Every structure is written in C-alpha cells, then in structure tokens.
Amino acid sequence: MITSELPVLQDSTNETTAHSDAGSELEETEVKGKRKRGRPGRPPSTNKKPRKSPGEKSRIEAGIRGAGRGRANGHPQQNGEGEPVTLFEVVKLGKSAMQSVVDDWIESYKQDRDIALLDLINFFIQCSGCRGTVRIEMFRNMQNAEIIRKMTEEFDEDSGDYPLTMPGPQWKKFRSNFCEFIGVLIRQCQYSIIYDEYMMDTVISLLTGLSDSQVRAFRHTSTLAAMKLMTALVNVALNLSIHQDNTQRQYEAERNKMIGKRANERLELLLQKRKELQENQDEIENMMNSIFKGIFVHRYRDAIAEIRAICIEEIGVWMKMYSDAFLNDSYLKYVGWTLHDRQGEVRLKCLKALQSLYTNRELFPKLELFTNRFKDRIVSMTLDKEYDVAVEAIRLVTLILHGSEEALSNEDCENVYHLVYSAHRPVAVAAGEFLHKKLFSRHDPQAEEALAKRRGRNSPNGNLIRMLVLFFLESELHEHAAYLVDSLWESSQELLKDWECMTELLLEEPVQGEEAMSDRQESALIELMVCTIRQAAEAHPPVGRGTGKRVLTAKERKTQIDDRNKLTEHFIITLPMLLSKYSADAEKVANLLQIPQYFDLEIYSTGRMEKHLDALLKQIKFVVEKHVESDVLEACSKTYSILCSEEYTIQNRVDIARSQLIDEFVDRFNHSVEDLLQEGEEADDDDIYNVLSTLKRLTSFHNAHDLTKWDLFGNCYRLLKTGIEHGAMPEQIVVQALQCSHYSILWQLVKITDGSPSKEDLLVLRKTVKSFLAVCQQCLSNVNTPVKEQAFMLLCDLLMIFSHQLMTGGREGLQPLVFNPDTGLQSELLSFVMDHVFIDQDEENQSMEGDEEDEANKIEALHKRRNLLAAFSKLIIYDIVDMHAAADIFKHYMKYYNDYGDIIKETLSKTRQIDKIQCAKTLILSLQQLFNELVQEQGPNLDRTSAHVSGIKELARRFALTFGLDQIKTREAVATLHKDGIEFAFKYQNQKGQEYPPPNLAFLEVLSEFSSKLLRQDKKTVHSYLEKFLTEQMMERREDVWLPLISYRNSLVTGGEDDRMSVNSGSSSSKTSSVRNKKGRPPLHKKRVEDESLDNTWLNRTDTMIQTPGPLPAPQLTSTVLRENSRPMGDQIQEPESEHGSEPDFLHNPQMQISWLGQPKLEDLNRKDRTGMNYMKVRTGVRHAVRGLMEEDAEPIFEDVMMSSRSQLEDMNEEFEDTMVIDLPPSRNRRERAELRPDFFDSAAIIEDDSGFGMPMF
C-alpha cells in the first residue's frame, strides 16, 4: 500500500483549488453509482490476463480484425472510405481532437471492454514499430511474456527505427500526440473506468512487461507511456487529495453546528463521500506504486540515455505537481544520483527538473537536505564538458543563491565567477546573471529609494561601478574586459550604460570622506567603459564569442541607434576633458582614443558641436607630440583616419589639422636625418632620439594614411643604406625605416592599381621595389635579431604581393612589377628559417635565462617564430618558392610538433593539393635528409634499435597516414615515393665490395612504412623494380645488416588480400555507414576498377605536374554498433593503421594516367572482386540474423566506433572516462547525518534490494 509510506496522500491539507477538469467536488451520483471494488490493495497482475467467456469470442475476433488492418511501422492502412481504422493511425495522423478520440474509445469500452482493451494493447504494440498484431488466441491463452516474445519476432530487422526515433516533423508530432492521448485517456476515465480493476490492471501489466524487454523499441515506447500514465495518475491523486480536504472541511463545519441546525443526512453523505474518496485514493496509490516499482526504478538506469532522460523528466513533473507526496528525499535521491550520468542529455534533464523545483521558494525547506548533499556536485557541473549542461547548472546555482544565500559558500561562488570569462557565450551570460544576483542586486529598499534621487558618482550605480572595478582587478584577467562586459550585458545593462556616472568618477575629485580611486582602478574603469561603449555601439559580442554578426531585429536596431546617439552626445563633450586629465598616461590615453570610432560623427555638425571637435583635435595633437609608444600613436592615427571619412562634413576641418601635423613632423624628420648623416659615428643620443621619435610617429601615421606626397621613402632608404655600409645605425631606427619604406611601397601600389598607370610609373615602382628587396636581403645578415626578423617578414610579404598573382583579375598590365625570387634568395630565406625557427629548447632556455624573461616572454617568442614559419610556408604554398624547400620543414614535424605541428601539417596538405607527385617526392626527400644527417653523426653502421632510427621510422609512419584511405587517389604519388626511395637506397655502392650492403640500405626499413599504401598490383611492380637493383648474392644474404632489405621485400609480397580490401574501402563513400541504403546500388569500387586504365607504364614516367581535381568533403564518422549496414562489408573495411589524411578527398578521375604496369588481367580482377563481394554479403546476412533487435540494459552502449587512428581511439577513451557515472561514491559525512536521520542519498544502498534500493519506497 502506498499509504504506509506516503502519509501525505492521506493527511494532505493542500487547499489549492482543483483542476478545471476535475471540478470542486465529485458528483454524488458518481460516488454512489460506482461499483464495489473487491481488493483495493491488490496490485495489477503482471503475468496472466483475465479469461474471457466463450460468448465473447466472436465479438473480440471482430474487434481484433478491425484493429489489425493497419500496418505498424509507420505506414498507414485505411479502409475503403479513406479513414484510419486503428488508434495508432488516428493518433499518428492527429487530424481529430484527442478528446473526441478518447471519448470514442471510452464508448467502445462501455459497449465491450475486451475489444476496446485489445485495441489499446495493439496501439502500444504498433507505436513501438512492431508489425505484429495481438490475436484473440494470444490474448486469451498466453501470458504477457509469451505475447511480448511473439511480438518481438514480428519486428522488421532491416530497420532500427521506430516511431519515437523516426526523423521528420510527422513523427515529432506523433510523439506529442502519443503523450497527449495517454494524458487525456486517464483524465476522461478518472471518475469511473480506472477503478474497475480491469483496464488499469491490464495496461500497467502490459507496459511493465514491455519495459523489461530487451528490444529497445518496446522498452523506449512503453517507458514513455508508463511515465506519462504515472503523471496523469499523479494529477488524479492530487485532485482526490484536494476533494478530500474540501469534504473534510465541509464535514467538520457541519458537525460543529448546533444540534438543532445539524443535518444528519448530510453528515452521513459527507462521511460516505470521504470514505469513497479515500478508497479511490488508495486505488490510485496502488497503481502508482506498481508503475514506480515495476518500471521507474529499473528504467531510470537503462542502457539507453533517452529512456533514462524520460524517467528523470517525469519524476521532476511529479515532484512539482504534487510536492506534498513526492518532494521528499525518497524521490529526490534518484535525481541526485542521476546528476552523475555519463550522457549529457540525462544530466540536462536532471538540472531542468531541479530548476522547476528551486524556482518556487516555498519548496526550499523540503530541498534543504538535498541541497546540502548534492550542492558540490551541482557546482562542479558548471564546468561540464557539454556547454548546455554547464549553462543549466549555472542557472540552477543562481536559483539556489536567490532562494538562500547561505546555501553557497564563498568558494562555491568563486567557482562560478570566473566563468564570466568563458569563450562560450551562453555559459558566460549565465555566469553574468549569477554575478549580478550576488554582487549587484540591491536588497535594501529604503537605501535604494534614498540613493535613487542622487545622480552621478553618488547615485546607486556609483558604488556598483566601484564594485565591478574591484571584481575586474581581483580576477587578474585584465585583457578580457570585453568578455566581462558582454557577460553582464543582458543582466546589468542599466549599470553598464551609466556613462555619466563613470565619467564623473574619473573627472571629479572625491568628496570629503570618500576614498579616491587608485591609478589601477582608474585604468580598469577606463578599459571597462570603452568596452561598454563598443558593446552598445556595435550590438554584438566581442571577437571570440559567437559565430559572427547576426541580423538585428527592429527593436534591437532602434536600441542600438539610441545608445549610439546617447554615448556620442555625452563623450563629444567629456572625451577632450578625459584626454586632458590623463594625457601623460599612455595606457589610459590609448584606451580613451578608441572611443571616437563609435561616434555618430554627424552629430558634430547637426548639434553645432564643432568647438568640441576642435578641442578633441587639439588634445590628440598634444598626445602625438608627447608620446612615442606604438599603441598610442596607432590609436591617434586611427582616430584621424576615422574623423577624415569623406562622407562627413567635418572631413575638411580634420584634414587640415592632420596635414599641418604631418608637415611639422616631416620637416623635423628631414632636418634630423641630415644632422644624423652628417655627424655619422659622432652623432649623440639627442640626434638619434630625434630621428627615432619622429620616424616612429610618421611610420604609425603612414600605416593608415597616404603620405606618399611627402616622399618618406627617400630618407628612409638613405638611413638603411648608411646602416648597411657603415654598420653604425641603431637597430630601432633600421626597424622603423624598413617598416616605413614598406608602407610607402604599398601606398604607391594602391595608387597604380586604382588608376591607369603609365609605363614610366610602373618602371619607377619596379626600381623602388627592387632596391628595397635588395636592402632587406642584405639585412638578413645583420647582427641584430629584430632587424633580421623585420627584414625577413617584409621580404616574405613583398614576394607574396608582387608575385604572379598580382596579374590576376584582369591586371596583366602589372606584369613588370612581378618579382620571382632567385635561387640565392630562396636559400637565404630557408637558412633563416632553419636558424631562427627550429632552434633547440636548451638554446631558447639559456637565452631566456640570460635576459631574465618570464614565461609570458617565452610565449611571445614562440608566437614570433610561428609567424616567421607561417610567412615562409605561404611562399611554398603559393608556388613562389620551390616545393622541395619544404623538405627541410617537413623533417621537423615530429621534433617540433607541439610548437609548429599545425602549420607544418597545413603546409603539407596544401602542397599535396598543388601536386601530389611533387609532394610525395618532397616527403621522401625530407626523410632522406634526416637519414643522411644520422649517417654523418653515427657512421654507416646504424643501430636499427636506436631512438634516432625509430624517430625517422615514426615520422615516415605519420607521413604515410596523411595519404588517407583512398589508395587509388594517391596511387601514383605513393609509387613515385617508393621509386625514389629505392633509388636512394642503392645510389652508392659499398667501397668494400659488392658482398657488403650499400651505405643507404637501412633506408629501406624507413621506406617499408609506406608499403601499406600500395595497391596489390603495384606492390608486385615495385618489387620487380627493386629486384633490378639486386644481385643474386644480395637475395641470398640473411645477416643482420641485410635485414632492412628483407623487411622491405616482405612488406611488398605480403598482405595482398588486406590491401585488396583496402582498395574497396578507399573507394566507398561516407554513406556506407548509414542505417539504410538504397537497394540495388552497385558498389562504387567495382565501377571505378572497371573504368580504370591499367595499361600505362610508370618506369619511364617524367616529372610533369598533374593537377588534381577539386576537393570534396571528407567522409563522416558514423555509428555502426547497433545498426549494421545493408551494403556489402567490403565497402567498409579499412586498414588498421590508416587514418583520415589532412588532405580533403577528391573525385576519382578515370582520365588520369595511372602508371605501374604489370597488373593482373582485368577479367581476373573482376572475378576475384565478385567472389569477395559474395562472401561479404553472406557475412552481412549472418550478422543481421544474429543481431536482431536485442539489447542488454546493464551498461550504456557507446555507438561511435569508426575511429581510424590510435590517437582518435585514445581521445574517445578519455572522453568516456571523464564522463560522470550514475552512482555516487559513499558520502563522507554520511556517519554524522545517519545519527539524525536516514541518508536517502546513499548510492551504496543500490545493491541491497532486488529492485535497486536498500530502503522500501512504498
């Protein structure tokens, strides 16, 4: 009996009004007319159906025939009039109102309950996707288990889908209709039919049996039905409880009347009504008890995540709907345990269920023990690897904070605080909401009302802004102010837009008794203020958050315009004052100068505010003259560029001010250069500083402004030539002169490309570029590293800009400006990369120790080296530098993988797209270089087991993996690689005689790593080519020094069948792993092999480039555990060592000439192909027959297994290991709590009860 464990169902004092469908009271006629129940405490039978009388047989058979005419697996069958004939069809189509459908069924039940019940049984069977139909003989003579076993045999084994999992809007609608049908059915039957001890016993017994099936479709569908059935029963129980309370109050009121006014008949009637309600409630509790213990406690830990999620979602509904009965530790423990589920969707349902409870503050006392027990787990879930779960966990923690601030410790809050800096915006916004609730919510209404009358620094926002600044400084993430502002934007927008208060805090002196802001606090406030201005003006998240700019709605657009006007009108006046106050502080000025780019500059004219523009220009000029820091100068230059925009009327005024400023600096620069060059080595520090400071300012302005009319290139070139010839020029001057000259050349190129240049203009620019490239090349040998790095970067940039691509887009007239680097320059660039990028870690550490630089400087140095490598790699990718130069880069792939692995891999991928053959030659060349270096270090007698040899072999293995799975596509490239490798191995003869191995013979062991990428017929051809270099003596040798040759030969003559199958897999598409494939589609590899031209030679191949076709998307990884593919298995087999290459897949081109002759005849090839395919079809059929639809429910099943490399498998294992298990470990504080009350959350109790729990639930 439920009543023993849930006294609240008996003693409920809930005074909430009843639901509209139940009414305030039960009709007396319904109470009196209800038939007597035999054994109200008897749970429904789960084994045997009630027997039917012989007289009912014909009627039942007629009903079964009517109910069974529809097909189950989603294909409706209609009668002659086009109307659906089964409940399944009616619910699936959803054309009729659900209440009318249920009313029709109830009417049928009243006429003949067996026919109606059988229709309902077949409804659940068909909703599971089963083709079978329960017949009268089965219904009468077989137990539930036998019926379910019979229905299991009727499933369509070719498909793993069933209505609840089928895609498409129709089936999504079906799920909602299915749930609605169950709810309406119980609601309409709640006054009579559900108490007849027949309907509910039969339905619950069937659903209990189906939920214990090994067939996923049965288990999933019946669990959903049972949980929705339970939810409807909970609603009925709640209504009964309310009616009981009302009846009890009426009875007490009548009994308390004076004897003369008391109506005894009414007292008896109320007493009888109360008794009937209690009996009904006992009956409902028995039903809920059967569903909960028979279904929920087993299925909430089902192997299928969707089933577990259904259980948790519904128990949350029960606890919220009927909190007096269900919101206690006996039920909450299931949600708490499932917080550790390994699947994110289940954890998400747990959090959603808890959110609905914590939203109601009246329920907090009942949640106190649960909060104490699972608070740590909930807080830790804010760092969940699935962002959706993390967001909901943060929202739940916010609700807990809102209900009781004492529930969370300072440490718990700090764990959420730092998430405002998360790159994932929903997580950050949720954390911002938490931060707003904790720090910025005002809780004193009187103080708020008093402060609301004040404005500026004394307004309510004044203290909150100070608090925000302190939080920002304490977080020690000062480069992420934009992220902090974005996180708080939705919850604290009013505070963040109070720019008046911010500027008053910065400009006004503190009043007496008020603590002044420190320099750090002022800098932080300025940075935050600029970020709020950007957020308001642009109305989209900062870089790194979100996928890009979205289209604003009309309301958002209006808000953006209003905010932009508001900030413009305010800062047009206050910005000059802020610049004046903080003009000496470079960091503050650089931030303040970001503000004008967000102005609506039209307001200067429309608002008659030109005087404020003059004040701003005056302050900017003062800042330029005062500072030489690059950040400040670039900010000033950008501000001038924005104010000079041609679409605004203020452009002329700003252009005049800018020209005057540039004139002054150019005159000063020309005079200081003359003084410096005249004095030569005798120049003092003042002369050097004058040149350097002025040149820095001009370089910063030249970046954003066309200063070619001032001819800065001439003096810069003079400084560079003097530095090269005499070597006494300071490195900073050289660096700035190089950069300024570079900008000058680019602006000249812009003029030429935008206009109609004459031949003379082209020749002048060509001469300028040629002379500057020569200077940069000479600077590569400079003793100062910054000079060399700057020269290298500018060389790479200019070679890219003035390459053959300059003529694309109809600009053939610019051909005189194209520069192709000669061999000497290419060698110098490559040597620079080798010397400055691929440096040993020890050398780097020593240099860092000598300069006393910290970890941040190491990261900065690595960033510079990565830029150098990327600049040179672009020259290779765009065919400006010969591809063979990449060999020196590829050979460092393993050693410097952590630092440059992504750059090198991308370079390899792009070069392969340019020319597969040449790329393969480059790869083998890089391995040959490493081998030669090793021979020079250790001599010709290499130790094959040494780490150096193993490293080369590992690098070769990695290179082999990059060729991908499609061996036909890479066939000629791999063949060429083997050809070059063999020639290298036998290039030199041993000076001691032919009986000794060639010096490079050990290289064959490295080459054998690529043998798995050869086709079967190509292995024979390569073997034949190898034998041309072998003598009879070599073939007979078995000494250790000849083992590389033996190993390589073995790799070419073994594995034929495996390679044959790998060809098939390489030609298959990504659709081979799908659940269902189109019938009759021929295997792709057969078609390709038949179309292949196999009569071309490879031995005499020339090195002509073969352009590859365009890329196609790489095949997707799909699940193959539970749902086998109906296509031949030959299309799915892949080599164990293969992985998806970095190169995208290409369409096979039958016209491409494939070399390597000596292949088997085409007829023999096709015959073996057909034999292999027939065998695979047999294997596939056997797998389908054995597989069936059975599943074990002991452990969750992971389906994603098509991983193609060891690293991917390791990543998958790590992902599974760090997910959460369902069961909690024993609590550390269980002993203390056990003295006070039982610990309902102890997951160790799971093993103590056959139902899964150590304590009786009911």
Curated annotation (Swiss-Prot):
Residues 53-62, 1137-1146 have a biased composition (Basic and acidic residues). GO terms for biological process: cell division; establishment of mitotic sister chromatid cohesion; mitotic spindle assembly; sister chromatid cohesion. This is Cohesin subunit SA-1. GO terms for cellular component: chromatin; chromosome; chromosome, centromeric region; cilium; cohesin complex; cytosol; mitotic cohesin complex; mitotic spindle pole. Residues 296-381 form the SCD domain. PANTHER family: COHESIN SUBUNIT SA-1 (PTHR11199:SF6), STROMAL ANTIGEN (PTHR11199). The keyword Ubl conjugation applies.
